[in-house]
Amino acid sequence: MARAVGIDLGTTNSCVSVLEGGEPTVIANAEGSRTTPSIVAFARNGEVLVGEVAKRQAVTNPDRTIRSVKREVGTNWSVDIDDKKYTPQEISARTLMKLKRDAESYLGEQITDAVITVPAYFNDGQRQATKEAGEIAGFNVLRIVNEPTAAALAYGLDKGSKEQTVLVFDLGGGTFDVSLLELAEGVIEVKSTSGDNLLGGDDWDQRIIDHLVKTFNGEHGIDLSQDKMAMQRLKEAAEKAKIELSAAATSNINLPYITAGAAGPLHLDVTLTRAEFQRMTQDLLDRCKGPFEQAVKDAGIKVADVEHVILVGGSTRMPAVTELVKDLTGRDPNKGVNPDEVVAVGAALQAGVLKGEVKDVLLLDVTPLSLGIETKGGIFTKLIERNTTIPTKRSEVFTTADDNQPSVLIQVFQGEREIAAYNKKLGTFELTGLPPAPRGMPQIEVTFDIDANGIVNVHAKDLGTGKEQKMTVTAGSSLPKEDIERMRRDAEEHAEEDKRRREEAETRNLAEALQWQTEKFLAESGDKLPTESRDQINEALGELRSALGGQDIEKIKSAHAQLAQVSQQAGSQLYTQQGEQAGATGAQAGGAQAGGPDDVVDAEIVDEDKK
């Protein structure tokens, strides 16, 4: 049976895990790290760079490096690179393809099935877009799972049959949510979830960047925010400073040659204390309180009844965040899980559940936001309340607002506001062909169906005529199937192109190495070779130098093979020649030792013990 992987597709970093012998294993990437930066860059030569290599070149290539794209998922955002528009789905797919390649390299087999996680507070459009990113990357997305739910699954699977209440506080690079779950006898039931999709570690970084820009402007009168390369350096420095301040009381941010003024190059040197950092980010910390209180209220659980608190996301390592969670819950967070990896581990376990590898586990998730339609007066009429366990199906009968109304326009929204326009519009469809009738007479049944991925289907039916209309809510950002297929093919072509580039680089490296070794061999031993062999090597060496000066890889391969052959022959000749010389020298030495009778000494061996 083909393996399935679990993927935490994060704002800042991503992680992939797989079940091995029933136990989840986090897969290290090609660079040896257990997490991969969610950064994609388009090099000038057309190569697509992902992860650590993309991060390393960001300073010199700021316009073509995309990070934190998860914040744009489910929107109409796009980026232009070389006159081509890339959607958030396509950029996310590049990161997923990198994780897929690394997993396949580790496992030694093709991987197609995956469970991908999303923030619990993602709406329908964002979930659809994440699923599409997986499809573009070549995955069959088995399930979209909420990150806190995956974390609870990873944490709670081995906790036995005792019923317990768990609070998951998930503060990642770009999103934040809080979930309350009940765990008992293999059943993991989400009671409530709340969050903020625009709050995360990136915002803490931005405060440091703003502080550095303001400080530098005050000292030198130069606004670094207008310099893209400088801003990339500030971004990296801010992230490092934030991490340092989790362990140290101060952090020195030193960036030489950050820009140039009238008098010459200028350097940035700022010391930031933890107290100062916490003061400038206090309002961000305060924004975590609202979703926490909402989740507790919706679950109908007292804070005192929460038995375990799990921290998820790298941003929870900040001391101020840990202290906030301790203050809100009255207990120390659990230290037994890795906040960077626990979500991917849970996703791998859920993949195991779906594949039948993990038994006796039932995951009951919820929809994070209420779903409904717009009715007369612009009112938002809810059909499915937030925190309803999914999958679920609800129906309600509506009627017309005007006499002889020939059709009904059904506008689907997701959110909590009473006025429909203030909520997130998911889609619109029309039920036509209604027979003339006074208002209030037609009976139109509207049914909402949410699947286990949290993706919505809506169905409207005129009970009088039997006419019906269906739609899968695709939101404004979702892509038509043909676009997904086209993007998947593009991604595959890029993968082939990247593979070809790697092979070309390896061929060139091997050829250059052989060239150097041969030149060294000639310098050290060329005078010992027969003239014919030396001429053959020089001729082959010249052909390889010429080939390396061009771009024809086949020519380089051919010249490399030819030089390898003649070099090997020459090496064999030299070895044989040296062996013959050594034999001759040995024979001469042996003859010298085997002298005449004058060289013979008569002697007795005396055994001292027998004396």
From Swiss-Prot:
Cross-referenced CDD domains: ASKHA_NBD_HSP70_DnaK-like
Q: Which GO terms describe its molecular function?
A: ATP binding; ATP-dependent protein folding chaperone; unfolded protein binding
What ranges does the record give for the region Disordered, renumbered to this chain?
467-508, 567-611
Sorted alphabetically, the keyword list is: ATP-binding, Chaperone, Nucleotide-binding, Phosphoprotein, Stress response
InterPro entries recorded: ATPase_NBD, Chaperone_DnaK, Heat_shock_70_CS, HSP70_C_sf, HSP70_peptide-bd_sf, Hsp_70_fam
Q: State one Pfam family annotation.
A: HSP70
Comp. bias (Polar residues): 567-576
User: What segments bear the compositional bias annotation Low complexity?
Assistant: 577-587
Composition bias of kind Basic and acidic residues appears in 480-508
Spell out the PROSITE patterns in the cross-references.
Answer: HSP70_1 (PS00297), HSP70_2 (PS00329), HSP70_3 (PS01036)
Q: Which residues carry this modification: Phosphothreonine?
A: T175
- Disulfide connectivity? none
Where are stretches of biased composition, namely Acidic residues? 599-611
Q: What induces it?
A: By stress conditions e.g. heat shock.
Q: What does this protein do?
A: Acts as a chaperone.
**What family is reported?**
Belongs to the heat shock protein 70 family.
Put simply, this protein is called Chaperone protein DnaK
Organism equals: Salinispora arenicola (strain CNS-205)
